[in-house]
Design a protein with these regions (language model features):
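Helix-to-loop junction immediately C-terminal to a conserved catalytic motif
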Residues: 50
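A short, surface-exposed alpha-helical micro-motif characterized by mixed small hydrophobic
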Residues: 207-209
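Conserved ABC ATPase "signature" region
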Residues: 114-137, 185-188, 236
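ABC ATPase NBD Q-loop/coupling interface
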Residues: 59-78, 118
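The feature captures the beta-strand-to-loop junction immediately N-terminal to the Walker
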Residues: 35-37
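Catalytic Walker B motif of ABC-type/P-loop ATPase nucleotide-binding domains
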Residues: 166-170
Length: 238
């Protein structure tokens, strides 16, 4: 079952097509990877899917009906879509714990609704932070974490969200091997929960390990798609 579709999707910058007439279907509950050389349009595509930038031509639709071209970009989160960025984005002046709680409570962490369900949310936050090894740092400000820890916290926030479609832009970049294992485990857990994950990644070993389906892009166009082992046997992708 397709959960996200693009049809003739196009985005131009200074007259050049960064994404060029792209039509894809993403299957629900699967891990789909987007691969290709630098400058091939991968991040631009993620930005379009997440509503970060305006579509020039074509449409993005969710479950075959909700067309992104007909709603405001800031509304995309209401349609069950969330994402991470190449540059980590957290609430820097909040604690590690509050960075999770603010997601669990949909930003109501400081009001009476949070107090009513405080123990439930704290237990859930502890579970998430223990998965990434940051429970002991729960009272530390996010800004004081190392880069790898900050990236783990950003990924962990995804676990706490109610989103159904998760867009991950190079989630393994700059991580030590032990952290890569943690993030891989989180991505697999998201799939087990029935979430749809769309992943940009350059490491082909990780692509083979995690992906159910692969899209190959270059110059904004779709060059190939299919199961990872079949696609990667036929192509050399940077």
């Amino acid at each position: 079952m397709s959960v996200l579709q693009t049809k003739n999707l196009t985005k131009r910058f200074d007259g050049i097509n960064a994404v060029n007439n792209l039509s894809i279907d993403v299957e629900k509950g699967k891990i789909t990877s987007i691969i290709g050389p630098n400058g091939s349009g991968k991040t631009t595509l993620i930005n379009l899917l997440s509503g970060m930038i305006k579509i020039d031509d074509g449409v993005v639709s969710f479950n075959g009906s909700k067309e992104l071209s007909k709603i405001q970009p800031y509304q995309v989160g209401f349609y069950g879509v969330t994402r991470t960025f190449q540059e980590v984005r957290l609430f820097e002046q909040m604690t590690v714990l509050d960075n999770i709680l603010v997601v669990l409570t949909e930003r109501n962490v400081f009001n009476s609704l949070f107090e009513k369900h405080k123990q439930y949310h704290l237990k859930k936050a502890q579970e998430v932070l223990e998965k990434i090894g940051l429970w002991e740092k729960r009272d530390q400000l996010a800004v004081n974490l190392s880069y790898g820890q900050r990236k783990l916290l950003e990924i962990a926030r995804i676990l706490a969200m109610k989103a159904e479609i998760i867009l991950l832009d190079e989630p393994f970049a700059g991580l030590f091997p032990e952290m890569v294992k943690i993030v891989s485990g989180i991505i697999k857990e998201l799939k087990q929960k029935g979430k749809t994950v769309i992943l940009i990644e350059h490491n082909m070993d990780l692509i083979r390990e995690l992906s159910d389906h692969v899209f190959v892009m270059d110059e904004g166009k779709l060059l190939a798609e299919g199961e990872p082992h079949k696609v990667l046997e036929k192509r050399e992708v940077v």
